[in-house]
A protein has these predicted regions:
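Active-site and donor-binding regions of nucleotide-sugar-utilizing enzymes
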Residues: 1-17, 24-133
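A nucleotide-sugar donor-handling region in carbohydrate enzymes
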Residues: 109-177, 210
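C-terminal alpha-helical cap of glycosyltransferases
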Residues: 318-338
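Acidic donor-binding loop of glycosyltransferase active sites
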Residues: 237-247
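Short acidic-hydrophobic, aromatic-tinged amphipathic segments that line or gate anion-handling sites
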Residues: 42-50, 222-227, 282-288
């Protein structure tokens, strides 16, 4: 999940939990989502990481209780937040940012370090990381596991009625954007072809992605450019099988207890997929239409394997990262007020 989508999910949860709270984003005005951000936003010429003066000025003027740096941030920005009395949260989504958060000078600036994946994906704290935490006695480290918008107990009936499908009767195909990764667009096209071929083979499907499959003469395939995260979660819960990239979409499907086929659209996803395959919660497929189709038809023909994948996914017990974040924020605000 991208930094903005993750932060937006947390902010939306915070606004629902604390209706009187004030929430503000700092975004690049060049980002495609900047113009439609649902919260007040300060727009900068590029990533806020590169505009420390503007970030520091806003922190000093606004004086927030909590500042969240999602996979970005400069030392001067963190220091400004601490100087103004704010609790500082840093979210790391990659190894480089995780190493950055464990630098000794940053350990003294961060109150909470949230790792943006489950422990079995991101890895347990190393001996050296634990040693540093013992020395500095901070920050608190948490794994967000998975960001899954919407009520976990909600039923998918509404959106399924809209698309004319029955629960457990369709395959959900979600390639992700792919546009930010070399070769990503080509892989998304392979997802499209596989979705079309599955429909031709007699399987109902829902495709959610930026490239739309060719018209399905059998009308078994429903295609959407985008859907809200809450509706995507409902589609996952109602699916018989989910075919996804190796990013956050895969983890969301696993958290829903669904059998998954994972296809990498970026280099860093291969290791993530391998960890899921080794944990028995996903099946991998090469990023080409024939391999995706073969994996899907093989799995769909084997009810025992489908059920086994779903069972292991449910047993993994991934926690709701939004709830983890909100509990942490509540504790930080209580500590600051105390």
């Amino acid at each position: 999940m991208g930094e903005y989508a993750r932060s937006l999910a947390i902010a939306t949860g915070a606004a629902a939990r604390w209706p009187n709270s004030s929430i503000r984003f700092m975004l690049s005005r060049e980002a495609p989502y900047a113009a439609r951000a649902p919260f007040p936003a300060t727009l900068l010429a590029s990533s806020p990481t590169h505009h420390s003066a503007a970030v520091i000025e806003l922190i000093e003027e606004w004086r927030p209780d909590v500042v969240i740096f999602d996979n970005a941030g400069r030392t001067a920005q963190l220091r400004a937040a601490r100087r103004c009395g704010a609790a500082v949260v840093y979210i790391s989504a990659r190894r480089r940012q995780r190493r950055k958060a464990f630098r000794l000078r940053w350990l003294g600036l961060i109150d909470e370090h949230w790792i943006a994946y489950p422990e079995f994906i991101a890895g347990s704290l190393s001996v050296f990381e634990r040693f540093k935490l013992r020395i500095r006695r901070r920050p608190r480290v948490r794994y967000l596991d998975v960001i899954l918008a919407g009520d976990r107990d909600s039923k998918p009936d509404l959106i399924l009625d809209r698309v004319g499908l029955a629960a457990q009767g369709y395959v959900l195909i979600v390639p992700g954007g792919g546009t930010g990764h070399p070769g990503g667009e080509a892989t998304v096209a392979h997802f499209c072809a596989a979705a079309r071929d599955l429909a031709a083979a007699g399987f109902d499907g829902v495709f959610v992605g930026p490239i739309q499959p060719e018209a399905d003469p059998h009308r078994r395939l429903r295609a959407f450019g985008t859907v809200p995260q809450s509706e995507l979660a409902q589609l996952m819960r109602g699916a018989r099988l989910v075919i996804a990239n190796g990013g956050s979409t895969l983890l969301q499907a696993i958290a829903c207890g669904k059998p998954c086929i994972a296809v990498p659209i970026a280099g860093d996803q291969r290791e993530r997929i391998l960890r899921c395959v080794n944990a028995g919660v996903a099946m991998g497929a090469a990023p080409d239409a024939a391999s995706i189709l073969r994996a899907a038809t093989t799995l769909l023909a084997d009810r025992g394997s489908l059920d086994a994948l779903a069972g292991r996914a449910s047993d993994l017990g991934l926690t709701d990262g939004i709830e983890v974040a909100l509990r942490a924020i509540d504790g930080l605000i209580a500590a600051n007020c105390g």
